[in-house]
Amino acid sequence: RELVTNTYINDRDRSDVRGQLLWKASDALEVRLIADLSNIDELCCGVSNLFNGPTGAVIQSPIVNGRIYPGVANANGAPYDRAAYLNKLPRNIVKNSGFSLHLDWDLGDFNLASITSSRNQKTSFDYDFDFTSGSLGEYNVNTGDIDTVTQELRLSYDAGGAIRGLVGAYYFDEKVKYDNTILLGTAFRNYAGVLTNPTNPTAGLQTFPSLEAALGLPVGTFFRANTGTTINTKQDNDAYNLFGQLDFDINDRVTLTAGAAYTNTKKDVNFAVTNSEAFSGVDLVQLGFAQIFGALTGGRAPTPANFAAFPAQASLADTASVRACVAGQPAFPAGPLCNSALGLYALQFLSPVVPYAESSSDSKTTYTVRLAFEASDNLNVYGGISTGFKATSWNLSRDSKPFAPATPARSPLGGAVNPWYPRYGTRYALPEESTVKEIGVKGRWERVAVNFALFDQEIKNFQANTFLGTGFVLGNAGKQSTQGFELETQFKLSNAWQLDFSTTYLDPKYDSYPNAQGPNGTQDLSGRRPAGIHEWSVSTGLTYNWSVGAVDGFARADYLYESKVQAVDNLPITLASRQVNTLNASVGFARDGWDFMVWGRNLTDDNYLLSAFPAVAQTGSFSGYPNQPRTYGVTVRKNF
């Protein structure tokens, strides 16, 4: 619930229309046209405060006049109260449309299948990016437009003999447009000023007027309301895949399957940006260098002539310009000379990105090999190995930054390494390659079915996407592996009753991930368990089916358990974890093309986090997305 307007959010307002047209041109040729249209227009999605850090006191002070629920400074929040103070209701609009044309042509021993599809998705997300009622951000609109066209052709062969197979081709063409505009609110300047001197807010409010005067800028230039940044990105993705697979019956009970696929992907990316927020464009290293040099030389300007006249002072200022001051350390000369301006670096979260137009081209051949043995008419044992490939992924968000060069940037006079400017990051994630080994058994009898599989998965250059509170960062773990097993069972207790049970055990780890993103910079996650992957998952369901005259009905209950896991890699498990214990139930019936269902979800009213992240522009504060509470509903469907 949004407490400023007393409005419930996370509502559901969705519509969906789908239709099919079937044409049987002959006994051998069938053509099917499927079209759909859907619309979402909701107040979504609700965010809860997980920890109200030191910046919370500033937001809740009269200077900013904002509120954070529940409002206790430097304390845990109450995320499962599902309440928040916002200065804007979040709105989520999604429009989907598309069609597909399926052709199935029986040519005797051969079969030709063709699937042509076209889809469009338009999105618009607008929300309060600081998730408080303080006017830190007035405008944060994300719009997307994705057009996708695909074509698949498959020619399969089955003459009833020992050999079966297929060959095919798949083409994928996707055009993505993504725009994001962020504008600061009326309170951000005061908020930023107080953060520069929290113990003396009055002095802090003079930080930026003094800095503007020193730079010869009009007062009010920095963090002016309704200034910010806009990005306009485009990505054209063209890909094709050529594949084939062959099944060979070695004897009546043993079948060997082998297949291969060649994938080629090309992506062209165009990134444009405009930035009207002036402070994020200030080079604080250059600023600090000028201030330090002036202080050491009695106010002289940082010019080549003065550097030559005062070489010792110039060298000291050059080294100090890239050294951040540490709280509590003695002032110079008792302590090291440092650049106090770098204390403002975290406030440059709308730092400009140089526009670029780049491309990537990737190709890979993957394969699958599988051996299956029919131990009996009811039992099948199999084992196999397969490989996979995922092409380069580009960061289309406003935090897309170039990779750091082999030779690091230098301080103004070149005497020291400059880790501050230019700002480097990750513009894309390298392609990832996977290998999966699996052995298993499948059994099916009159009233019992059992599937069991052991697997070992290895992903090289695992692609990770982490939200740091001010933007998304793409990266690669050198290697990520997972071992585990999966069990699925089905028991027909009678003609009316059915019991389903499944469980999965996963033991994943980052074999190599030395530069992962953490809450306070990079961290080494090598040897650690990836966030969000549960060790144990258990699902069970009981269904009762019945018929009375022309009415078919059912009653079903299902339960899901997922063991405790860290929610995201860059927040500790003590702050953001997830453990699931949910019970769902439904009762429904169908008659004359009408389906009617009454359902309840999360009847245990279980609480857990879907995701979490560092709060935007609020160092030390964290937010998260809680799950849906206990929910009831009715579904009515008509089949024409």
Predicted feature residues:
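Transmembrane beta-barrel wall of Gram-negative outer-membrane proteins
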Residues: R1-T55, S97-F99, D147-Q151, L155-F172, ...
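Gram-negative outer-membrane beta-barrel transporters
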Residues: S156, R164-L166, Y170, D252, ...
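Residue-level signature of outer-membrane beta-barrel architecture
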Residues: L21-K24, A35, D104-L107, D147, ...
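C-terminal beta-signal and adjacent terminal beta-strands/loops
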Residues: L183-R189, S494-L499, L560-V568, F589-F640
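Solvent-exposed loop segments that connect transmembrane elements
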Residues: R1-Y8, C44-Y85, D128-Y139, T181-T230, ...
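Transmembrane beta-strands of outer-membrane beta-barrel pores
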Residues: L37-D41, L107, S118-K122, Y171-K175, ...
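Repeated loop/turn-to-beta-strand initiation elements of outer-membrane beta-barrel proteins
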Residues: A28-V31, D109-L112, A162-G165, R253-L256, ...
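Membrane-embedded beta-barrel scaffold of Gram-negative outer-membrane proteins
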Residues: H102-L107, N111-S117, K122-Y127, E374-Q483, ...
